[in-house]
Amino acid sequence: MKKDIHPDYRPVVFLDTTTGYKFLSGSTKSTKETVEFEGETYPLIRVEISSDSHPFYTGRQKFTQADGRVDRFNKKYGLKDANTAQ
């Protein structure tokens, strides 16, 4: 294997800017900001969305029904779906 071709993988703190939630993970992303977390100093990476603020993980996700071409055709000509009739 070639030497010195892999980026530096190290522990970093990710900060969700919408909620203020911090978590420690490994990353190769470089940053000049640092933060004290659990008694240690780590590089800080700011993110807009994390598991603490994403609607899927918080339970605030809304599902919308996207009608496809077949559904529109059936609706237009008054046909019923064979799968839902049973």
Swiss-Prot record:
Q: Which domain of life is it from?
A: Bacteria
Q: Name one GO biological process term.
A: translation
Q: Name one GO molecular function term.
A: structural constituent of ribosome
What the entry lists under Pfam families is as follows: Ribosomal_L31
Disulfide cross-links: none
Q: Which PROSITE patterns match?
A: RIBOSOMAL_L31
Q: Does the keyword Ribonucleoprotein apply?
A: yes
- Listed InterPro entries: Ribosomal_bL28/bL31-like_sf, Ribosomal_bL31, Ribosomal_bL31_B, Ribosomal_bL31_sf
Q: Which GO terms describe its cellular component?
A: ribonucleoprotein complex; ribosome
Coiled coil feature spans: none
Record bears the keyword Ribosomal protein: yes
Whom does it interact with, and what assembly results?
A: Part of the 50S ribosomal subunit.
Family that this chain belongs to: Belongs to the bacterial ribosomal protein bL31 family. Type B subfamily.
Q: What is this protein called?
A: Large ribosomal subunit protein bL31B
Name the gene for this chain.
rpmE2
